[in-house]
Amino acid sequence: MSVFVILILFNAILNFKTVGPAAVSSKTVDCASAPCMNGGTCADGFNNFTCFCEEGFTGSMCETEYGCFRPWFYGPAFGYCYLWERVDYNWTQARESCIDQGRGAELASIHSAEENAFVYAQIRRYAWIGLSDQVTEGVFDYADGTPVDYLSFPDKNKQSETRDCVYVKHLRVDNWSLLDCRANKTSICKSTTTFSATDGCATGWVHNPATGYCYFYEERGGMWSKGREFCLDAGADLASIHSAEENAFIFDMLTEFVWLGLNDLETEGVYTNFSDGTPADFDNFPADNYQNEDHDCVSIRHLEKTDRYWFFLGCDDTVTSICKRPHEVVATQAPPYLFTTTDVPATTTTIPTTTTTISATTRTIDAMILIELLLFPNNVSSIDNIFRVNNTILVTASVLGSFQALSSQILWSITNHLSGDSVQYTVYSEDAVLVRFTTVSIFTIKATAVGNSHNLTATANATVKHVCISSLTTSVKEHCDAPHPAVYLRAFDIHISTHMELNGKCIDPMTPDFKWRIFTSTEADDVVTAFEKITHTRQVMIPRGTLPYGIYSLNLNAKTRLKTSGEVTGEKEIISWLEIQPPPLVAVIKGGASRSHGVSSNLIVDGSNSYDPDVPPGSSSNVTFLWYCVVVDPDVMYSSLDEAIQNTDNACFEDEGIMMNSTSSMIEVIANKLNANVTMNFWLNISKEGQISGLTQQRIHLTLGLLPEIEISCISNCNMYIFTAERLVLHASCTNCDSENEDVSFRWSLESNHTSVIGDLSSQTTTGLDQPYLVLKPLTFDSISEMGSIILRVTGSQSDSDGYAEFSVDLPHNAPPALGSCVVTPDEGYALQTDFTVTCSNFTDVDEPLTYQIILFSHVDVVDWMFVGRGEGFQLYEGSAPIKDGLYLPVGVGTDDHDILLQVNVRDCNMASTSVYISATVHPPTLDAVGMNLVQELLDMALLVETNVNALLAVGDPGQAAQLISALGSILNSIGDEDDSEEGRETRSEIRSFLVDCVAAIPVESMTSLKQSSAALAVVTHNKQEISTHVQMLAASTLSEMTSFVKSKSGSYTQAQENIESAGTILVEGLSNILSAAKETERLLSDDTSQEREDHKNLIEVAVSTINDIQDAIVAGKIPSEAATIITSPALSIAVGSISRDELAEATFGGPEDLGSFRMPSQDVLNQAMEHALGTTVSMKMSAMKWNPFSWPGAGGESIKSSIVGIQLEADQMLEFHDLTADIDVYLPMRETLSADPVSVHITKTSSDSVLIDHSSLPVDGALHLTVIAENEPMVALSICTARISITESSCVGTDTPLGVSNEDPDTDANFTWTVPLVDLKAADGIMIRLYDSEDQPGYENDNITLSVFMHTLQCNFWNEDQQEWDSTGCKVGPLSKPSTTHCLCNHLTGFFGSSILVPPNHAQPVIGGHKLTGVDFLICVLIGYGIYCVALVIRVVGCSFAIRVHKVL
């Protein structure tokens, strides 16, 4: 491998001018004796010469042979050449690939720790070496036959009968491991052969030794300007010819006319210079050459009898081209004495700064020389003169000021500081040279202008780093058995992905840019850009309809940039091809595959919904309609029009044939032409020039009378063959019914042959079977896919008549892949310390290729002795390889014995899938248990994760990056459960902050990457005590951006809706963690820290906005009357649904008890309130937060501590209801009835306790709830009563209500719960609590019984926007309230935070005061309805039977 390449360019070529007078050269030519050996090229210097050695040779005269061909790298300490093969192969394929390299190459053998370290430093990923025990288990040998004299396995290396081949890991100590030889990995090849020299021209270019130039024949053809543009892009120009020999050389390359770099466009008949700037000192026009005025560009044509003549052609003619650029003379690689010349080499190793000097010591500086380094061919500057290996650099020198030069040439000197040694290489040129550095180093470039009395010298440093992109490939998501180029229909989105490998030596944090461009050409051969987009991830989607029909070139340019400076660290471009074709036309007859019709009314058969998929909705498709109609047997179904015509000759109407006269999109048949008990089969054929025609049919069964005209329309999954993996959405309607006055009921069924019901859909639908809409879940038809076609029928009933319509479901004959097996190895290990591999085998399917998808579930349940994943899964992998290694698995939940579940979905190209489940045990990593060692190990682990995450993001792999983040987050969570030290918590908090930053850096450009990133964020934010305010805000903002992406993808009723709801679940989990952390932070805030409270307010506003966006995204794809989407989490729950406007009356919506629900009043009540709303569908959204988040000063709720529930209804606009004549029923959850500090009460057989009530602070109605836990005597029976309490005596006013406890465990910790109506309580002073005395009363073991008493009452509040405060006007407590649920009756529903907020007070906060009554008395202030109500609990021990003295607290 050469360290640098010098391409000598002359001043005239590059048009660079030296400033100042020129002098005549007086060089001495020393190359006449041809001193350079082995093909070396000699260059004259001032009284010296320099040899440019061909690759494989070194020495001052190229006398020493050594080295390796690129891209092999030389191991000088071992005398071998090595190649890292970046393509993934199994072990056998990898060995074959090495052998195919020739020159004795084999999979590498490693014989020392030094050689192992050398190989380790060259690779970026795991790589096969040539060691295995495939012949004899446990006996290892190398493929190249060398002895096994060195091993580098870890102490705990696992070996099994299926793990026979050895691979090397990067970033590891003891870095060898065993794996199944069928797994795909990169590989290391090794060769002992030194290689021959090359000609210095790139692949495809032809070298002319006589001129020292490289030539390229461009065969596509184009105008003269296009030919030159192509050459310039290649770092060349159209060819100039300067001799008969060069003319003959180019002539022999040709097959037709080609452009040369000569024209007379500026002045007719005058051509003095070629386009590359060189003089036109040779031409070869024929003697009788005649030039038209419009023929200005020169070409040469390959004809035997033309004597290699040149001709003038029109510059716009289409002609191929010849490009020409300088030969790349290569200097050798070798040890530090690399660039030797006949001069004495420099010995200094100091890298000089960029300077300009003169040799005279007494001369005033009135002249200077400037050096500029530019990237060629675009001639742009580089940041800090930093370049990459194999960049071509244009180095220019300009002499400024008054300087008497001895020669017009510049003496260039390049010093290589590789390995601390400085060796110079000197060459003469005019004021510009091209330099290509082929190794990493820092080079000093010195330019010297030699003058009569003194010299001018300047230096510039060039830092050369590795090119960071090693390989780049693309794959387009193709249909089954797709040809090449892949064919796509214009009506469908095109998904393209890329795979990029990085150079393992590039370790700085980088970001990728992928520039996707699609080109086509016009009839005039102009290149047109049809699509262009820049992404930061490896996928791009070309929206449907973007590309016209034709064949396209797909060009991908990938760049990696340093995060810190934006410097380009690598660039690669590849080209592939695709073809866009027109789709078939789609014929549609409104109503369904068949339907009924009563002969009492005209029959309309409507095909106006037929369409061309390439024409935007609402635009005319310009198709031609052709109708056919035959009378058929109602029990016989024909699959084609030809079959129907062959089996019947009965036209539908006597005056017409089978082909009807109508060519319009709609047919209307008057009633008197219709006969009952007849089945007519209508066929519609639509056609359009240049496209495949569309054909469909509809059977209409005619019956007596007037029937409801029932029609079915398809909303989602409406292709010719449905995708069983997507949900199917249908809608039924009655076209002749008055929806306001006549009620039609619908009933759906699944049938075959029109008569027999073959399946129960009730468990497979999210809408039920009695709604106008029918939504069938994905995979509903998988169990019956062998039938090919089935019927979905809807019957519409009205009064005493029924009508029906049918939708034909054509199922592809597509069985899922044959069941194979998958294993995870090892099946037990440690997070971030064990490499897990999933290996699948024996899955087969005719519809290849197969795709393997691995989903991780961290939480595992056991159902029927089987592991079942809980919650949303994390996608670890999706691709075509059946073996996936290097998986980063998180720590399993400790309560699940650290088990995790992997679901592997194997699907064919038609989306039929088979799933298998495998489990593994993932423990926390083995770390030091305590002290600084633990802290340091965690920090080291975080640094390793950071390095790998940056590398993964640099190649556009956000999924693998999210895996790493999630794995480290799970480790922090497992440690946090056991380590409560301040230092440990602080360290984990810092790491969590860093991980949130990592998640925020992941670009979200697909639903898959969004779910992976949001899931990682949920893991990282799991521990509320380790998430600072800053991290809370960053996490909330990141979730907000993710939610905006989800919202942009919403509104589709297809499979995308499943992804949106899944993403919503993960996002809610992350928001719940943030809200929990925010509550913890709020609890710790000091009252006088205004900035912290402002930050808290900002955080809540972002969270609330995100909640609204999640709900909006989900509801956009909800079908009316479909089951609500309910997402629950510890701190936040939401419910989202949709309903038809005419079904809103008396509708109930909500979720489980901890979310709440509401019921709307009757239609009469709602009609007036909704008269201005125009929408036909109402979206319904609820959200419940465990705590009131609006607790900052000014929000009006500083004292409100309970949960809140938001309700929002929206049609075309937000629906608000005021002063309704009937109430809306709202049921609100009571989450924390036992969260307050209880009062400890002690009673005996002979003493009781009483509660003294301040009536002035009680609500008007409702109830008081008492919850009592018997701390030390759970099997007691208590009774309470309302009592009138005085100083001298007490007595029950209300009925004595006993409450016993059974032997069964209660649902909560509470043993006793009473509800006392406030109206009863107001007739007394308070409540007495005592032991219940009855015959079956249990025996009490203790004289003293300890009770914990909790109390709360109920009130329904809402946020009054006009008054900017919490209010209860228009809301009251309903009769169905209970300790766990508050029933509110409200005559209004208005807006706040995008919804109406209702607040149930759900716990008491007793404050034990110092007010002393008789005996042992306590003053308890209870938060009731978010006012402070004081209740005196008087606890006394007296000597008489239940005597109580009472004082009323004012």
From Swiss-Prot:
It is found in: Cell membrane. Autoproteolytically processed at the GPS region of the GAIN-B domain; this cleavage modulates receptor activity. One of its GO terms (molecular function) is calcium ion binding. It comes from the Eukaryota. Residues 1356-1405 are annotated as: GPS. Residues 1274-1405 form the GAIN-B domain. Disulfide bonds join C31-C42, C36-C51, C53-C62, C98-C189, C165-C181, C231-C323, C297-C315, C1356-C1384, C1371-C1386. GO terms for biological process: detection of mechanical stimulus. Glycans are attached at residues 48, 90, 175, 184, 273, 379, 390, 455, 461, 622, 661, 677, 685, 753, 842, 1311, 1344. Keywords: Cell membrane, Disulfide bond, EGF-like domain, Glycoprotein, Lectin, Membrane, Receptor, Repeat, Signal, Transmembrane, Transmembrane helix. Residues 27-63 form the EGF-like domain. Receptor for the egg jelly ligands inducing the acrosome reaction. Could be a regulator of sperm ion channels. This is Sperm receptor for egg jelly. It comes from Strongylocentrotus purpuratus. The lineage of its organism: Eukaryota, Metazoa, Echinodermata, Eleutherozoa, Echinozoa. The gene is REJ.
